[in-house]
């Protein structure tokens, strides 16, 4: 006997929740966290004490759970609804149907009643009095009849109770009770109870209870209970229980329980349990349990359990378990388990397990396991396992395992394993393994392994392995391996291996190997190997090898090899080799080899070789060879060879050779050869050769040769040759030749030749020739020739020739010729000729000729001729002729002629002729003629003629004539003529003539000065009898 305890009856929803939202356990303690000891249903747990009282708070839904719990009597509070009590906690002892719950209270009530009655006394609470009284005014369960339960008395005769219109037939010890219009027929020891209009037929030892309008037929030792309007038919030993409007048919020793409106048909030794509105059909030895509205069909020895609204069809020896709303169909020997809303179809000897909302279809000998919302379809001998929301389809003898949300489709003898959210499709004999969120598609006999989030597609006989987030696509016979986040696409019989984050695309018969983050694309029968972060693209029959971070693109029949960080692009039949960080691009049949950090681009049939850090670009049929750090660019049929750090650019049919650190640029049909550190630029059909550190620039059809450290710039059809350290610049059709350290600049059609250290600048159609250390500058159409250390500057159409150390400067159309160490400067249209060490300066249209060591200065339109060591200075339009060591100075329009060691000075329009060692000084427009060693000085407009060693001085407008050793001095308007050793001095308006010598003529003694005759400005002389002597004091 249990002390201070009572039993309560209540109902919960299908999920064991009460009206307050508290979830009751299937067994054990339940407690209200918000307990308040006040009357009312809220803030506590409630129940119907002893199952007796008002049934209004109880749920009459077909899926309601009937709960029996044990409660401490001291914690109970009676509430308004009759028979209902409130309590803070309880212990669940039984959960089942209404019938099982009432039977539980009926069978265990005796363990509590005595204790309750014993404790009742004065002052006990109201609830205790209710417990003692048992309050039977509104019974929910039948009263307990102690006499019948204990079996102390046995009926000894048949009891028949019927209303009008009933027919009762019972054998010994039967009890028949029927409403009006009923018919009951019972065998020995049977009990039949029916409402009006019912029909009951029972064998011996049977019990039939039915509502009105029911039909019950039972074999011996059977038990049937049915609501109104039900039909029950059971063979011996059967137990049928059904709600109103139900139909139950059972074989021997079967047990059928169904809610109202149900239909149950069972073979012998079967057990069927169904909610209302259900249909169950089972062969012998089967066990079917279904919720309301379910349909169950089972072969012999099968077990079916389903929630409400389910449909189950099973062959013999099958087991099916399904949640509500599920559909299960299985052949013999199958085992199906599914959550609510699932659909399972299985062949013989199959096992299916699925969560709610799943669809499973399996052939014989298959095993399917799926989470809720999954779809699985398998042929015979297959094993499928999938998480919720998955779809699995398998051929015979296949094995599929997938996480939730996955889709798997497999041919026969395939194996698939996938994480959640994956998609796998495989033909027969394939093996697929993928992480969650992956997609795998495989042909026959293929093997696929992938990390989560991967996509794999393979033809037959393929093997694919990929890290998470990868994409692999392969035709038959391919082998693909990729790290996470990779993409691989392969034709048949290809092999691809890639690190994580790589992309590989290959035609049939190809082999691709790539580090992480690489991209490889290859046509059929190609072999690609790249380091991480590389990009490779290859045509058919190509072989590509690259270090990490490289980019390779090749057409068919190509071979590419590159170090890390390289870029290679090749057309068909090419061979490319590059060090790390290189870039190579080649058309068909090319051969490229580069060091690390290089860039090579080649047309078809080309060969490129470069050291590290080089850049090569070539058209077809080209050959490029470069040292490290070089740049080479060539059009078709070119041959380029450069040292390290060089830059070469060539047009078609060109040949370029350069030392390290050089720069070469050439048009087609060009030949460039350069030492290290040189720069060469040439248009088509050019030939450039330079030493190290040189710079050459040429137009088409030019030829440039330069020593080291030279600079050459030429227009088309030019020829330039320069020693080391030279600079040459020429327009078209020019020819320049310079020694080392020279500078040459020429216009078109020019020819320049210079020794080392020279500087030459020429306009078009000029010819310049200079010794070493010279400087020549000429306008167009000039010819300059200078010795070493000379300086020549000429206007257009000029000709300059100078010895070494000379300086020549001329205007246009001038001719200058000078010995070494001379300085010549002329205006336009002048002719200057000087010996060595001379200095000539002339205006335009002048002609200067000087011996060595001379100095000539002339204005325009002058003509100067001087012996060596002479000095000539004249105004414009003058003519000066001087002997050696002479000095001539004249105004414009003067004519000076002097012997050696003479000095002539003339004003403008003067004419001076002097013998050697003479000195002449003339006023403007004077004419002087002197013998050797004479000294002449004239006023304006005078004419002086002197013998040797004479001194003549004249005033304006005078005429003086003297023999040798004479001295003549004249005033204005005078005429003086003297002979040997004579001295004449005249004033104004004078005429003095002494010419005496009567040895044989010339006498002429004439004198005239002032008004009356001689006197004027003294002295005049003659003597020796010919008189006129008045010589001044010595």
Swiss-Prot record:
Predominant location? membrane
Q: Where is the composition biased (Polar residues)?
A: 261-286, 311-334, 357-382, 407-430, 453-480, 580-592
Q: Where is this region: Octapeptide periodicity?
A: 162-993
- In residue numbers, the region (Disordered) covers 260-287, 311-342, 356-383, 407-438, 452-480, 570-597
Task: Give one GO molecular function term.
Answer: ice binding
Where, per UniProt, does this protein localize?
Answer: Cell outer membrane
Q: Which UniProt keywords apply?
A: Cell outer membrane, Ice nucleation, Membrane, Repeat
Q: Looking at the UniProt record for this protein, which Gene Ontology cellular component terms does it annotate, in alphabetical order?
A: cell outer membrane
Domain note for this entry? Answer: Contains imperfect repeats of a consensus octapeptide A-G-Y-G-S-T-X-T; further on a 16-residue and a regional 48-residue periodicity is superimposed.
Q: What family is this?
A: Belongs to the bacterial ice nucleation protein family.
User: Extra info from the record?
Assistant: A structural model is suggested in which the ice nucleation protein displays a symmetry related to that of ice.
So what does this one do? Answer: Ice nucleation proteins enable bacteria to nucleate crystallization in supercooled water.
Protein name (Swiss-Prot/TrEMBL)? Ice nucleation protein InaU
Gene symbol here is inaU
């Amino acid at each position: 006997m249990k002390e201070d305890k009572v039993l309560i009856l209540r109902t919960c929803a299908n999920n064991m929740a009460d009206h307050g939202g508290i979830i009751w356990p299937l067994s054990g303690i339940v407690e209200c966290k918000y307990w308040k000891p006040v009357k009312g249903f809220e803030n506590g747990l409630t129940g119907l004490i002893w199952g007796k009282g008002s049934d209004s708070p109880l749920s009459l839904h077909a899926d309601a759970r009937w709960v029996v719990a044990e409660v401490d009597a001291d914690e109970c509070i009676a509430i308004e609804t009759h028979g209902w009590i409130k309590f803070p906690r309880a212990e669940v002892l039984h959960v089942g149907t209404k019938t099982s719950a009432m039977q539980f209270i009926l069978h265990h009530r005796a363990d509590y009643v005595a204790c309750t009655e014993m404790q009742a006394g004065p002052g006990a609470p109201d609830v205790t009095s209710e417990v003692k009284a048992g309050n039977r005014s509104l019974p929910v369960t039948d009263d307990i009849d102690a006499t019948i339960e204990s079996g102390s008395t046995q009926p000894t005769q048949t009891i028949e109770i019927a209303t009008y219109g009933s027919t009762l037939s019972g054998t010994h010890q039967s009890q028949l009770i029927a409403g009006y219009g009923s018919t009951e027929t019972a065998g020995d020891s049977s009990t039949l109870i029916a409402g009006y209009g019912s029909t009951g037929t029972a064998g011996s030892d049977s019990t039939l209870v039915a509502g009105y309008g029911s039909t019950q037929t039972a074999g011996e030792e059977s038990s049937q209970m049915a609501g109104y309007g039900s039909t029950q038919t059971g063979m011996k030993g059967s137990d049928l229980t059904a709600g109103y409007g139900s139909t139950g048919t059972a074989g021997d020793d079967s047990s059928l329980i169904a809610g109202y409106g149900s239909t149950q048909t069972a073979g012998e030794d079967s057990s069927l349990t169904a909610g209302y509105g259900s249909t169950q059909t089972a062969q012998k030895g089967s066990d079917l349990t279904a919720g309301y509205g379910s349909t169950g069909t089972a072969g012999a020895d099968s077990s079916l359990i389903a929630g409400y609204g389910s449909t189950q069809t099973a062959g013999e020896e099958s087991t099916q378990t399904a949640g509500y709303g599920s559909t299960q169909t299985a052949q013999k020997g199958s085992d199906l388990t599914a959550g609510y809303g699932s659909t399972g179809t299985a062949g013989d000897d199959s096992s299916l397990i699925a969560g709610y909302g799943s669809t499973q279809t399996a052939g014989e000998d298959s095993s399917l396991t799926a989470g809720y919302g999954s779809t699985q379809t398998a042929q015979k001998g297959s094993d499928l396992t999938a998480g919720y929301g998955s779809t699995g389809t398998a051929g015979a003898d296949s094995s599929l395992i997938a996480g939730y949300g996955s889709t798997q489709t497999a041919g026969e003898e395939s194996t698939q394993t996938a994480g959640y959210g994956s998609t796998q499709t495989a033909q027969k004999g394939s093996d697929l393994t993928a992480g969650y969120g992956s997609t795998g598609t495989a042909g026959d006999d293929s093997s696929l392994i992938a990390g989560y989030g991967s996509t794999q597609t393979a033809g037959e006989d393929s093997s694919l392995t990929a890290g998470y987030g990868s994409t692999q696509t392969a035709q038959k016979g391919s082998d693909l391996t990729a790290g996470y986040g990779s993409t691989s696409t392969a034709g048949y019989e290809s092999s691809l291996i890639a690190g994580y984050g790589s992309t590989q695309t290959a035609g049939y018969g190809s082999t691709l190997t790539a580090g992480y983050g690489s991209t490889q694309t290859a046509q059929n029968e190609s072999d690609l190997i790249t380091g991480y972060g590389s990009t490779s693209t290859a045509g058919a029959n190509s072989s590509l090898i690259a270090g990490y971070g490289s980019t390779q693109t090749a057409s068919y029949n190509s071979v590419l090899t590159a170090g890390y960080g390289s870029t290679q692009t090749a057309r068909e039949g090419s061979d490319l080799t590059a060090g790390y960080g290189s870039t190579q691009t080649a058309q068909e049949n090319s051969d490229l080899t580069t060091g690390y950090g290089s860039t090579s681009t080649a047309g078809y049939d080309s060969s490129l070789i470069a050291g590290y850090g080089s850049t090569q670009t070539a058209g077809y049929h080209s050959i490029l060879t470069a040292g490290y750090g070089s740049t080479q660019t060539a059009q078709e049929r070119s041959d380029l060879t450069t040292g390290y750090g060089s830059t070469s650019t060539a047009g078609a049919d060109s040949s370029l050779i350069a030392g390290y650190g050089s720069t070469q640029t050439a048009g087609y049909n060009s030949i460039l050869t350069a030492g290290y550190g040189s720069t060469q630029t040439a248009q088509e059909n050019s030939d450039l050769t330079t030493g190290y550190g040189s710079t050459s620039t040429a137009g088409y059809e030019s030829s440039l040769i330069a020593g080291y450290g030279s600079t050459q710039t030429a227009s088309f059809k030019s020829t330039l040759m320069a020693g080391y350290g030279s600079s040459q610049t020429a327009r078209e059709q020019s020819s320049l030749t310079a020694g080392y350290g020279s500078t040459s600049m020429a216009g078109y059609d020019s020819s320049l030749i210079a020794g080392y250290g020279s500087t030459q600048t020429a306009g078009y159609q000029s010819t310049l020739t200079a010794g070493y250390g010279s400087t020549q500058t000429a306008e167009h159409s000039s010819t300059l020739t200078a010795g070493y250390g000379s300086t020549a500057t000429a206007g257009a159409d000029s000709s300059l020739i100078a010895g070494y150390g000379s300086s020549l400067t001329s205007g246009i159309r001038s001719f200058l010729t000078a010995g070494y160490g001379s300085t010549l400067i002329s205006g336009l249209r002048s002719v200057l000729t000087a010996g060595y060490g001379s200095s000539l300066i002339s205006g335009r249209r002048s002609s200067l000729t000087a011996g060595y060591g001379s100095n000539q200065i002339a204005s325009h339109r002058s003509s100067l001729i001087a012996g060596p060591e002479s000095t000539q200075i004249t105004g414009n339009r003058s003519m000066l002729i001087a002997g050696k060591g002479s000095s001539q100075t004249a105004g414009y329009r003067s004519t000076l002629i002097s012997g050696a060691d003479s000095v002539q000075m003339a004003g403008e329009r003067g004419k001076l002729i002097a013998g050697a060692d003479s000195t002449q000084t003339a006023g403007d427009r004077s004419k002087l003629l002197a013998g050797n060693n004479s000294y002449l000085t004239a006023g304006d407009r005078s004419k002086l003629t002197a013998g040797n060693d004479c001194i003549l001085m004249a005033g304006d407008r005078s005429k003086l004539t003297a023999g040798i050793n004479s001295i003549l001095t004249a005033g204005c308007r005078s005429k003086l003529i003297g002979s040997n050793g004579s001295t004449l001095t005249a004033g104004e308006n004078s005429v003095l003539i002494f010419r005496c010598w009567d040895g044989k003529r010339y006498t002429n003694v004439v004198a005239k000065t002032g008004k009356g005759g001689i006197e004027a400005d003294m002295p005049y002389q003659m003597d020796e009898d010919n008189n006129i002597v008045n010589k001044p004091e010595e």
